[in-house]
Design a protein with these regions (language model features):
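Residue-level recognition of tetratricopeptide repeat
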Residues: 36, 70, 103-104, 137-139, ...
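TPR alpha-solenoid repeat register
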Residues: 73, 106-107, 142, 176, ...
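Terminal, low-structured helical/coil segments at or just beyond the last alpha-helical repeat
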Residues: 22-28, 202-251
Length: 251
């Protein structure tokens, strides 16, 4: 977003507030300040989506000057600091964003941040809070995140429960499908593992991990051509990966 477009966004919001309040300075009215705050937040998020975190800070700071406790502004600034690898500042703003009440979207983002920091128990607790919102449109992803966190906590049975719930909410969750395929394979439940794997391949591109799993499943079901084909893809696309090294060790 250019500076000209940014200024136009804010000025348009102020103009709309001015029109609705007559000739009163819009910044001296609650409606005008709210309009300016929302415009600054939108501008900051626009910069953030472009990867311009330094630019994003300026309008987000202005938004917080108008409304210090605003959840959206604090959550956006938390994402900025998370992107810039400033964990203490990110954590601070996530907490501020949630201080006025739980929001499933912010809780999920905060949980993701905590997961990235290796704080798995804290992340799990935040994801659990987010999952309590039955109307949150991305609830299936929250359960997927719960499953991933449970794996980090070495609780495979709990992880399967969460991945299963994620897939009940949305059958087309590639990561949940791949994880269920892997967990089923590890438990020697090869038929469901193959089912999950085939569902995964229909909706997502292959990666090193899925190619290795696919080759292993093909070997289990004595499909030598498929096993060889997937092995060649793994060699060609991911030659230096641990997955390819593991594949070689199994031949």
């Amino acid at each position: 977003m250019t500076l000209r477009a940014a200024l136009l966004l804010v000025s348009t919001a102020l103009l709309a507030a001015c029109v609705s309040t007559g000739h009163v300075d819009p910044m001296k009215t609650d409606k005008g300040r709210d309009a300016a705050r929302d415009a600054y937040i939108e501008l900051g998020i626009g910069y953030l989506k472009q990867g311009a975190t330094e630019r994003a800070k300026v309008p987000l700071k202005k938004a917080l000057e108008l409304d210090p406790s605003n959840a959206d502004a604090n959550a956006a600034l938390a994402l900025v600091f998370q992107t810039e690898m400033e964990p203490d500042l990110a954590d601070q703003h996530y907490r501020k964003a949630l201080s006025s009440g739980d929001d499933a979207r912010i809780l999920n983002n905060y949980g993701t941040f905590l997961y990235e920091q290796g704080r798995y128990k804290d992340a799990y607790a935040r994801f659990q809070q987010a999952a309590e919102d039955n109307l949150y449109p991305e609830r299936s992803r929250v359960f997927e995140n719960l499953g991933l966190t449970a794996l980090k906590m070495n609780d495979q049975a709990l992880a399967k429960q969460h991945f299963d719930k994620a897939l009940r909410l949305n059958r087309q969750q590639p990561l949940a499908l791949l994880e269920m395929a892997q967990l089923s394979f590890d438990e020697k439940q090869y038929v469901p593992a193959r089912d999950y794997y085939e569902r995964f391949t229909k909706i997502a591109p292959q990666n090193a991990r899925s190619l290795l799993l696919g080759a292993r499943l093909a070997t289990v079901f004595d499909d030598r051509d498929q096993a060889a084909s997937l092995g060649l893809q793994l060699k060609r696309l991911y030659p230096g990966t641990p997955e390819y090294q593991q594949y070689q060790s199994e031949q």
